[in-house]
C-alpha cells in the first residue's frame, strides 16, 4: 500500500513537471487599458494583488513532497519487514517488500533512491 502511495506522488510530480500550461498568462499579457476600466473613469492607482508563485516553485514543492513521501514509504516498508526481537520470526522467513519493484525505484524517484543508500 505504501508503495502505491509513493508511486502516486511520483506520478503527481511528473504531471506537475510535464503538464505546465503553455498558454498561461505570463508577463504583461491579459486584458489591459480600456478593458480594465481606464476609459471609464477609474482611479489611476495600481492595486497589486498577492504575489503568485511560478510554475518552477510549484514543481520544486511537488518534488520535495514526492521525495518525502517516497522516502517515508520506503523507510516504513523496510521497518515492517526487518527482524525485530519481539516478533518471533527469523529474518529469512519474510522477503522484503521493496525487492519486487526495486528495479524501478532509481528511475521513478531519484530522491528515494538516494535515501535508499
UniProtKB/Swiss-Prot annotation:
A single Gene Ontology CC term: side of membrane
Localization, UniProt: Cell membrane
Propeptide stretches in the record: 105-117
GPI-anchor amidated alanine-type lipidated residues: 104
Residues bearing attached sugar chains per UniProt: 87
Any Pfam family hit: Shadoo
Coiled-coil annotated residue ranges, if any: none
An MF annotation (GO) of this entry: nucleic acid binding
Keywords annotated in UniProt: Amyloid, Cell membrane, Glycoprotein, GPI-anchor, Lipoprotein, Membrane, Prion, Signal
Entry-linked InterPro entries: Shadoo
Main localization (coarse): membrane
Membrane topology note: Lipid-anchor; GPI-anchor
Signal peptide: 1-24
Disulphide-bonded residues: none
Family annotation (PANTHER family): SHADOW OF PRION PROTEIN (PTHR28552:SF1)
Family that this chain belongs to: Belongs to the SPRN family.
Protein's name in the database: Shadow of prion protein
Amino acid at each position: 500500500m505504501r508503495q502505491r502511495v509513493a508511486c502516486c506522488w511520483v506520478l503527481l510530480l511528473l504531471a506537475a513537471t510535464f503538464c505546465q500550461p503553455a498558454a498561461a498568462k505570463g508577463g504583461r499579457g491579459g486584458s489591459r487599458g480600456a478593458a480594465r476600466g481606464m476609459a471609464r473613469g477609474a482611479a489611476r492607482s495600481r492595486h497589486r494583488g498577492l504575489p503568485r508563485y511560478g510554475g518552477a516553485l510549484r514543481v520544486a514543492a511537488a518534488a520535495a513532497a514526492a521525495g518525502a513521501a517516497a522516502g517515508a514509504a520506503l523507510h516504513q516498508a523496510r521497518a515492517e519487514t526487518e527482524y525485530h526481537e519481539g516478533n518471533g520470526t527469523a529474518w529469512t522467513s519474510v522477503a522484503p517488500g521493496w525487492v519486487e519493484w526495486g528495479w524501478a525505484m532509481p528511475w521513478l524517484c531519484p530522491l528515494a533512491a538516494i535515501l535508499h543508500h
